[in-house]
Amino acid sequence: MKEKFDLVKLLNILKKNIKLLLILPAICLVVSAALTFFVMPDKYTASTQILVNMKKSSSDLAFQNVQSSLQSVNTYTEIIKSPRILDKVSREFDGQYSTAELNSFLKVTNQTNSQIITVSVTTGNKSESDKIVNKISKVFAHDMPKIMSVDNVTILSSAHDNAVKVSPIVSVNLVISIIVGIVLAILIIFLKELLDKRIKTEEDVESQLGLPILGSIQKF
């Protein structure tokens, strides 16, 4: 019974502060929308896929060759991000992007037990993301045989106007802002209730003052 009473009291507190519960999430929503559409820069990611094959010797078995290639994938990902590759890419762009900038744009990943490397570049310009990731892949494919003993480097897929917008994600930002607004409103409401020591009901007299109720005056 007490739990039911507490729930009713809780709902009454929220109902009494319904304006704050509606206004604060609305304010957060408007602020988030303004930041998302007018402040936060757009980011576009373009990707290519690369396959690196080790050189085969007459004594190598196909399985051993694949295993060797798999074990070397981590090395290849580090080489792609190395100054040896990115310095050359920077020169190809006539210094428009420094090596450090290119490295900040770049992300190199691969799936477990796969020889395929995914090279991704994220910038604020859709076409530039395409150009940079394609250039990095081409420079790597050209220079890799000179760096390590590999048979060939194949660019499986290039970026051709396929960069996708990765941020800001409007729907996610707006939903998060509403949730944050509701949480803040609830916190403010209950904090206000906790700090409010005024006696408003007969129950408050008993709980806060420890005095019995002798009678009450009705409102007319």
Swiss-Prot record:
Family annotation (InterPro entries): Bact_polysacc_biosynth/exp, LPS_length_determ_N_term
UniProt GO molecular function: protein tyrosine kinase activity
GO cellular component, as recorded: plasma membrane
Transmembrane segments: 20-40, 171-191
Listed pathway(s): Capsule biogenesis; capsule polysaccharide biosynthesis
Compartment(s) where it occurs, according to its Swiss-Prot or TrEMBL record: Cell membrane
The organism's place on the tree of life at top rank: Bacteria
Keyword vocabulary terms for this entry: Capsule biogenesis/degradation, Cell membrane, Exopolysaccharide synthesis, Membrane, Transmembrane, Transmembrane helix
Gene Ontology BP annotations: capsule polysaccharide biosynthetic process
Bilayer topology annotation: Multi-pass membrane protein
Similarity field: Belongs to the CpsC/CapA family.
Job description of the protein: Required for the biosynthesis of type 1 capsular polysaccharide.
Official protein name in the record: Capsular polysaccharide biosynthesis protein CapA
